[in-house]
Amino acid sequence: MTPNDLITPAPQWRWGRRLFLALVLGVLLLLATAAPAWASIHTYHEQPGQTTYRSRQSLRDQRDLAWQATVFKRYQGQTVQGLYLRLVGFPGQVAVDRQGNLQIDTGTTAHWAVPYALDPQTPASVLPDNVSQYEVSAVLNDMPRPIPLTLTVPLVGQSSTQIIVAPYVVEEWITIAQTFPEP
């Protein structure tokens, strides 16, 4: 055995190493170029002629309390019944002030004040005090691109709370705003 044999690997090891590196590179390329999954956007055919598109996310406010944020768009036939954001706080922890407006800010210049509004199929007596709902079509149709949002939710008996919404969630909401039922 010569000293060169110790430095230069055998040909079978060279091919094995190259194959391993090629496989690792291939997996990394697949992961890097994979399209994002919209697993949280769902379509419901609730009854004949009625379709609802929905995105549901779990978000946290500045006090680290969990909120469920659901954006849904309901069609009766080809007629849109509205695009709504429903916020659900933890029962017993918060009571939403339905007399106050939801404040939506982009952190730059855009600001919206959205009043409490129910969709036609939800009776007011059904929602408990930890739930609030807002018609947000004007907001989502006005957004040029998905950017972080700050939702300031008015509360009863305490100061308003702020919920930060990540751009990927806003992108789902914009996708729902731009979705139309198939004829």
Region spans (language model):
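N-terminal secretory signal peptides that target proteins for export/translocation
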Residues: M1-W15
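Low-complexity, acidic Ser/Thr/Pro/Gly-rich terminal tails and inter-domain linkers that flank the onset
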Residues: H42-G77
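Short beta-strand elements
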Residues: I163-P181
